[in-house]
Swiss-Prot record:
Superkingdom: Eukaryota
Family classification: Belongs to the BI1 family.
GO molecular function, one term: calcium:proton antiporter activity
Chain's gene name: Ghitm
InterPro entries: Bax_inhibitor_1-related, GHITM
Modification comment: Undergoes AFG3L2-mediated proteolytic degradation, upon hyperpolarization of mitochondria.
GO biological process: one example: calcium ion transport
Subcellular location: Mitochondrion inner membrane
Complex and partners: Interacts with LETM1 and AFG3L2.
A GO cellular-component term linked to this record: mitochondrial inner membrane
Organelle targeting sequence: 1-45
Transmembrane segment boundaries: 84-104, 127-147, 161-181, 192-212, 215-235, 246-266, 273-293
Membrane topology summary: Multi-pass membrane protein
Name of the protein described by the UniProt record: Growth hormone-inducible transmembrane protein
Length: 346
């Protein structure tokens, strides 16, 4: 599942720099597919025989042409539907924040249970989020350093199969490496692998630096607000409220994963390309926001149930990786939305 989140992360940046949506569709660009109607009127043998009208259905070739033909008016409508979907998700999130944050739920949440937590549970959660902050900082530094290298930036932005394959291999390899090293037995190699993983993810984020510092700073603030609000919801909600969403989230991740891959091969101005792109971006934003709720409660649950002196030790670096990937996916989609909005105003 972590590998699928990595793929969803990698396939977004190339779309930011392609011409996408505009506010009004040009009247010169219209859908050229016409609906042919065939009227079959058999010879009349009797005065009472009625005319029979049948509609010829579209062939597979016509459906393919309709899906791939540029239609900016339809693309704009698809984009608007995606934004309304995100707005609906934001409204639900605000409602949940008010409901659980104001203590209107009768069930006990993690924030109430924190009063009776042993000190080692508090230390585990604290160290997990400290590593999360460190990962975000290392990722930002890595992205800024790579942005100063024209050769590396050209390599990351080419979009060739070699670039995509090398990026996937580096992300998956670094993720497997950092998870395979023991936190207790090999703290030195574990931290080196953690820094390597954050650096690789910074290389993936680096193409977004072309959008400019002010826009990325806004995206960072918006992401901080989203992550902070959702983390508060997860902490105030009943401790296992969102842990039952694993199966639906897995299905949604598969859909966003397939849409992210499919959008790489279709033009963004076609109906099919715009639909897949909207699912990958807007649907992905809502999906990874829900993943953040799930992963936050999963981290808290793991910190509570892992024995203090058991054979299996708590690993704060491995625990924070899923929250880290959720945060990066949210940030990249917010930055993409802000970039397309800025281009539309121009």
């Amino acid at each position: 599942m972590l590998a699928a989140r990595l793929v969803c992360l990698r396939t977004l940046p190339s779309r930011v720099f392609q011409p996408t949506f505009i506010t009004k569709a040009s009247p010169l660009v219209k859908n050229s597919i016409t609906k042919n109607q065939w009227l079959l009127t058999p010879s009349r043998e009797y005065a009472t025989k009625t005319r029979i009208r049948t509609h010829r259905g579209k062939t597979g070739q016509e459906l393919k042409e309709a899906a791939l033909e540029p239609s900016l008016e339809k693309v704009f409508k698809i984009d608007q539907m995606g934004k309304w979907f995100v707005a609906g998700g934001a409204a639900v999130g605000l409602g949940a924040l008010c409901y659980y944050g104001l203590g209107m739920s009768n069930e006990i949440g993690a924030i109430e249970k924190a009063v009776i937590w042993p000190q080692y549970v508090k230390d585990r959660i604290h160290s997990t989020y400290m590593y999360l902050a460190g990962s975000i900082g290392l990722t930002a530094l890595s992205a800024l350093a790579l942005a100063r290298s024209p050769a590396l930036m050209n390599f990351m932005m080419t979009g060739s199969w070699m670039t995509i394959g090398a990026t996937f291999a580096a992300m998956i390899g670094a993720g497997m490496l950092v998870q395979s090293i023991s936190y207790e037995q090999s703290p030195g190699p574990k931290h080196l692998a953690w820094m390597l993983h954050s650096g690789v993810m910074g290389a993936v984020v680096a193409p977004l630096t072309i959008l400019g510092g002010p826009l990325l700073l806004r995206a960072a603030w918006y992401t901080a607000g989203i992550v902070g609000g959702l983390s508060t919801v997860a902490m105030c909600a009943p401790s296992e409220k969102f842990l039952n969403m694993g199966a639906p989230l897995g299905v949604g991740l598969g859909l966003v994963f397939a849409s992210s891959l499919g959008s790489m091969f279709l033009p963004p101005t076609s109906v099919a390309g715009a639909t897949l792109y909207s699912v990958a971006m807007y649907g992905g934003l809502v999906l990874f926001s829900m993943f953040l709720l799930y992963d936050t409660q999963k981290v808290v649950k793991r910190a509570e149930i892992t024995p203090a002196y058991g054979a299996q030790k708590y690993d704060p670096i491995n625990s924070m990786l899923t929250i880290y990937m959720d945060t990066l996916n949210i940030f990249m989609r917010v930055a993409t939305m802000l970039a397309t909005g800025s281009n539309r105003k121009k």
